[in-house]
Swiss-Prot record:
Signal peptide: none annotated. Catalyzes the phosphorolysis of diverse nucleosides, yielding D-ribose 1-phosphate and the respective free bases. Can use uridine, adenosine, guanosine, cytidine, thymidine, inosine and xanthosine as substrates. Also catalyzes the reverse reactions. Disulfide bonds: none annotated. Pfam families: Ppnp. This is Pyrimidine/purine nucleoside phosphorylase. One of its GO terms (molecular function) is uridine phosphorylase activity. One of its GO terms (cellular component) is cytosol. InterPro entries: Ppnp (IPR009664), RmlC-like_jellyroll (IPR014710), RmlC_Cupin_sf (IPR011051). The gene is ppnP. Belongs to the nucleoside phosphorylase PpnP family. Its EC number is 2.4.2.1, 2.4.2.2. Gene3D superfamilies: Jelly Rolls. Keywords: Glycosyltransferase, Transferase. It catalyses: a purine D-ribonucleoside + phosphate = a purine nucleobase + alpha-D-ribose 1-phosphate; adenosine + phosphate = alpha-D-ribose 1-phosphate + adenine; cytidine + phosphate = cytosine + alpha-D-ribose 1-phosphate; guanosine + phosphate = alpha-D-ribose 1-phosphate + guanine.
Length: 105
């Protein structure tokens, strides 16, 4: 199931722009203090590092991803999610715009 809306959030209006604009996101905070971000990755192959554990939820498009320490690329499409441990990294390969919500653990 894909998350479509969040109610009552506090949104940071200035975008987080990474990799020369290939990834753009906005951070927001839920009423209970939970932090998340929502964004898009444009066609590219990128490597992201994590401080906190993350759950990447696909809300549109698709990607292939590979977690640190593995050689296996897996696919994530709309309604799918994958987990990334804290203090780790993952590779992401995108051929069409990949729209996501990042849930921080």
């Amino acid at each position: 199931m894909t998350t479509e809306t969040f109610d009552g959030v506090r949104l940071t209006t200035k975008a987080n722009v990474y990799f020369d604009g290939k990834c753009v996101s906005h951070s927001f905070t839920l009423p209970d203090g939970t932090k998340k971000s929502v964004g898009v990755v444009l066609p590219a192959t990128l490597t992201f590092g994590t401080a906190a554990a993350e759950i990447m939820e696909c809300v549109g498009g698709s990607c292939e991803y590979k977690l640190d320490g593995t050689d296996e690329w897996k696919t994530s499409g709309a309604g799918d999610s994958f987990q990334v441990p804290a203090n780790s990294k993952f590779d992401i390969r995108v051929t069409e715009a990949y729209h996501y919500i990042c849930h921080y653990a």
